[in-house]
């Protein structure tokens, strides 16, 4: 029994999922470990839209790929350091806030 060969999509979050899926198939991968940033996978949308997950499966299926994991670890990297402007690139907009700069997530995360 062989293990599937998968690609983690986080390093390519600047590419649309459909483009990355096409490339991954061409590179010989069996499936993807999908990042929850870029347009690859939105957990909130998955909870609110009954058809959203199927659209992700359909994109991968078009290229004969499967989902093997979903990654949410990027936002967790913001918890150890003092939050500053560098974190804006890794925090989702609802955590970063509405233009409050680093003070927005500091305040929000302090009460969670």
Residue ranges of model-derived segments:
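N-terminal pre-domain/capping segments
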Residues: 1-112
């Amino acid at each position: 029994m062989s293990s599937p060969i998968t690609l983690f999509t986080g390093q390519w979050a600047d590419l649309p999922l459909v483009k990355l899926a096409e490339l991954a198939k061409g590179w010989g991968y069996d499936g993807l470990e999908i990042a929850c940033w870029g347009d690859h996978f939105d957990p909130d949308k998955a909870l609110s839209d009954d058809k959203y997950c199927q659209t992700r499966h359909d994109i991968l299926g078009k290229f004969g790929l499967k989902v093997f994991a979903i990654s949410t670890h990027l936002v967790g990297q913001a918890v150890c350091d003092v939050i500053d402007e560098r974190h804006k690139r890794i925090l989702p907009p609802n955590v970063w806030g509405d233009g409050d700069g680093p003070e927005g997530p500091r305040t929000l995360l302090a009460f969670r």
